[in-house]
Swiss-Prot record:
It catalyses: L-aspartate 4-semialdehyde + pyruvate = (2S,4S)-4-hydroxy-2,3,4,5-tetrahydrodipicolinate + H2O + H(+). This is 4-hydroxy-tetrahydrodipicolinate synthase. SUPFAM superfamilies: Aldolase. The gene is dapA. It is an enzyme of class 4 (lyase). Its main location: cytoplasm. It comes from Cyanothece sp. (strain PCC 7425 / ATCC 29141). Gene3D superfamilies: Aldolase class I (3.20.20.70).
Amino acid sequence: MTNFGRVITAMVTPFTPEGEVNYSVAEQLAGHLVEHGSEGLVICGTTGESPTLSWDEEFQLFRTVQQAVAGKAKIIAGTGSNSTHEAIAASQKAAQLGLDGALLVVPYYNKPPQEGLYQHFRAIAQAVPEFPLMLYNIPGRTGQNLLPETIARLAELPNIVAIKEASGNLDQASQIRQLTPTEFAIYSGDDSLTLPLLAVGGVGVVSVASHLVGDQLQQMIRAFTAGQVDVAQTIHTQLLPLFKALFVTTNPIPIKAALQLQGWAVGNLRLPLVSADAATQEMLRSLLQSLNLL
């Protein structure tokens, strides 16, 4: 059984002032995250600005972070694509690098029907039969919802072992849990829904907030699994304003601004994303100060 851990950080991609990938800062940030609660790192996911990275940049990032972490956390490569051929090639290369798994987003823009989604993910799984795969359902970005019945079919494939569920629908998450084996791991794709998702059978979170509060997320999940629901609820309530603030505009704009406020040289974003405006930066500064994060 593959265990990616409870708290997985969807890591930002740092850029230099010239807009090139800053591999040195990526290395430093990865090490910091692992020291502060992250048992896994998703590299080149949504938060990592994958749409504006080249495959060469992505694979260099995979190698850089893999070397920096040195086995202390799972490295999960964002190899999803709306081209099955490209997703297969990227996943095969990630497997050859010795990474711990891949995150595969639902194909976007071309809006395949459920049978097309099933065949897409099955083709990737069959191309890398020994490589653990995590599905990624985020209909707000892809325009298509991966339905529980389709997920259940995919969970029968031995190397499709988990899902990052970011539909925001707890009924759907409950149905996924009902239809899949207990060893199939369900991760929250929304920080604000991590605690509710645990209550319906989730195991953890693929998080943005864990850049800042990874240790606290670990404490919340541990408290819940130990039956200390009131403790978990208190942590959730304390962190909820942060969870909301990090999505006040398009992710990863706020988290990059927050990291810059903490002194991390993560740089700006690549167009068409833009940096946080002054009002957002000031809101984040005030919030981080109130949470003793500055």
